[in-house]
């Protein structure tokens, strides 16, 4: 698969990327499963509701059992009552995780990268570095490359690059092992350094 190789001025040449990573067919069902599982595994239980034993209430019987003409009632904490406990309350201990084995996950990443390559959303650079940790420098460099919303995958995250880009809402810098499926499809473009492609091939090939 041929990808764009950009220089510092944004001029493009051709880079021959391995087909084992960037030349696979797109498997929509697999990618959907991998992305949904990734989102589910990142989810933490933050919903809490009270059952009838946890709501604040009195144990006094609201009225006598017989003779009033009303339906019998034992406690105001009953789920049938307004202000009563939930029958099946949500709990912070809920487990939302979904299992995706390594083979499927890697195949999903390969499928995403291949589709991004076909859509011309991947570009390659020799290296990506900055002289100092200045956001202004990072913005100028990305502008010269014609990029705004971009995921930068580099073999080793340079401290200057990390500090300069961490305040940019549409830019993220990661190493190949941290390139997750959600980030790959979230950003408009993916910028990969040559050494990072070698690492991806070693990880996913």
Curated annotation (Swiss-Prot):
Q: What is a single molecular function from GO for this protein? A: structural constituent of ribosome
**Where does this protein have compositionally biased stretches of type Basic and acidic residues?**
48-57
GO terms for cellular component = ribonucleoprotein complex; ribosome
Does Iron appear among the keywords?
Answer: no
Please give the biological process terms from Gene Ontology that the record holds: translation
Keyword Membrane (UniProt): no
Q: How does it assemble?
A: Part of the 50S ribosomal subunit.
- According to UniProt, the name of this protein is Large ribosomal subunit protein uL4
Species the sequence originates in: Bordetella petrii (strain ATCC BAA-461 / DSM 12804 / CCUG 43448)
